[in-house]
Amino acid sequence: ATLNGIKVNYQIAGSGPALLMFAPGGWRSVVSRWTAAGGKDAWKEMDGLATLSRHFTTIAYDRRESGLSGGRVEPLSWDLYVQEAKALLDLAGAKQAYLLGCCMGASLALAFAVRHPALCKGLLLHWPVGGYLWRKKGHTFFQQHMDFVRANGLAAVVERAPKGENFWMDAEIGPWGSPAAVYPEFAAQFVKQNVEQYLDICARSRDAIFN
């Protein structure tokens, strides 16, 4: 589906009350993180998506700039992430939903509930992140990416992106490395940006998400 102008990979399964799922993994926030194979560090042997789909209508997705979803170079923020989730909930036809957030997804679930309390039937926050160490990690990752861009340029990000897979596994590819690796048209536009303007967007994204 295309939501707010960005391709979003999503999966709706099961029946029952709607359960909007915000996956763990930072910039690896993808549907497969809810499965036994893709989410071993969070779920051990349990296939969370299959289990929950027996009781709920599960709505899971690759968050923008993650997995098979696309992206757009703009200052990232919790508001943008909430807008995407709200559009997905509307697409699913759900009037209300329980919210399940894990890791960074717990922060997004809280942000959604604050902005749309009437849509939230309940919150389940698993393995939430936050605090000084989380902030330090985020700032460090953004700094590594920005230093890489200053030294090597944006074309080097596109070249490295398929090997790095995502920002949380290879900080130097940055938050837009995943769509650059998946979508050639995104990569082609990515390299044409003004570097200084891009670095400013990175800094604003870092501060909005981690400060």
Predicted regions: what is each one?
Residues 3-70:
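Conserved HGGG/HGGXW glycine-rich cap/lid loop of the alpha/beta-hydrolase fold
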Residues 14-16, 93-95, 117:
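Active-site acidic short loop of glycosyltransferases
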Residues 69-82:
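Catalytic nucleophile-loop/oxyanion-hole region of alpha/beta-hydrolase
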Residues 79-97:
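Conserved acidic catalytic loop of the alpha/beta-hydrolase fold
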Residues 81, 99-101, 126:
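Short beta-strand immediately N-terminal to the catalytic nucleophile in serine-hydrolase-like folds
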Residues 101-105, 109:
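Gly/Ala-rich beta-loop-alpha elbow adjacent to hydrolase catalytic centers
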Residues 110, 114-115, 120-151:
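Flexible "cap/lid" loop of the alpha/beta hydrolase fold
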Residues 143-211:
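Alpha/beta-hydrolase
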